[in-house]
Amino acid sequence: MKIGVHPNNLHLRLARLWPGAFEEFDPEFVGYREGRDTAALLEKGDIHFGGTGSTPPIEADARGLSAVYIAASAPRPANGAILVRRDSPIRSAADLSGKRISLIDGSFHTYLLARSLEGAGLGLADVIRIESGDSDSLRDLVEGRVDAWVTMSPRLEKALTHEEINLLVRCGSTIPNRSLFWTLARHNIAGETGQAIAAELDRVGRAVMADIDKAAALLAAETGSEGDAQSWAKVLRSRDLSVVAAAENILAEQQEEAETLYRHGHFSLPVLTGQSASTGGGR
């Protein structure tokens, strides 16, 4: 089985490093740059499933690709946030109107921003979205090229130690922010296989939580790692790495997000979210 791995999905990144992970699946871990590339790789057959935040599978459904949900992590309340400069006049989401906001657009960042704005009576059209790409977004924020920055672990933890940065919104109070593991209907992953994938993700996640120092050392030793073992241990201790098979509650969360993003004009047409592989059928 070809399993997609990108730097921002900690579960699969750890699975690639963890001894014996997915052994029964004869795994080939396929590295790629970021979660928004997942649908294209699934479409080409380069991977059989991947893990992302909540938005990429909805983007896939918007393109008519028929996303199929396999599993979901626990909510990740500490994994994402909107940051501003300490000297900024921005004190609440209502103050973001007309401001330049750096984010990975089309990821869960877009949903976090939309829900935060909605709570203040604003919409995505009321702000200027700046694609962060490969730029140094922390520097862009500190030096005033953007007014706010939507970010996630492990960059978030580093940014929060910066003396010039303030936390505006933490995603835990705004969206579930789960890690989702999904495929496309064309790959025909059977219900039993989906259940087995979910169980293995959960097993690895619980093994990591039982030996955080080992997992942190593995992450720190990766080429181009974003932090040392101590900083990775801090990230891991903030996470519940347990995983469950995708069920109706997950599909309902995804549909709520799809409707929110449509309401904000991110999608031009309504999107019906995908089915669950682990239950062997549709909604």
What are these regions (language model features)?
Residues 20-32, 46, 118-132, 145-146, ...:
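A local structural motif
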Residues 191-266:
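Secondary-structure end/capping motifs
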Residues 16-18, 80-90, 178-193:
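A bilobed periplasmic-binding-protein/Venus flytrap-type ligand-binding module shared by bacterial periplasmic
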Residues 136-220:
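Pocket-lining segment of extracytoplasmic ligand-binding domains
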Residues 1-8, 93-107, 199-206:
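Short loop->beta-strand "edge-of-pocket" segments that line small-molecule binding or catalytic clefts
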Residues 29-40, 53, 127-143, 154:
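Short helix-initiation/N-cap motifs at beta->coil->alpha
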